[in-house]
Amino acid sequence: MSTARINMLEFDSEEDLNQRAEMYQREAPELFPNAEILLTIKTGPTSAMSVSIYPDEKSAEESLIRRNKHFKAAEVQPREAWYLVGEVVQRHVK
């Protein structure tokens, strides 16, 4: 069964969020090659939620190492970041 990681991010400014989103759009497919789905939603002027779907828990755990390195090295840092992990129980993509 697929595993999802949901990241919640809060930035100091809308500009920081936009810069980070542009960088993530360019780099995420290469950073997380095992991801089946990479999705980012801007939930407010300075906040975003990203959802990554992996084929299994092992792939999700392996990506966490890359995620943590990426977060530490990123030029634009979120003010606050946390994540949840769970089993995907329903998926529909049209």
Regions found by a protein language model. Give the residues of each.
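Short S/T/G/P-rich N-terminal loop/turn motif that feeds into the first structured element of a domain
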Residues: 1-51, 55-69, 76-94
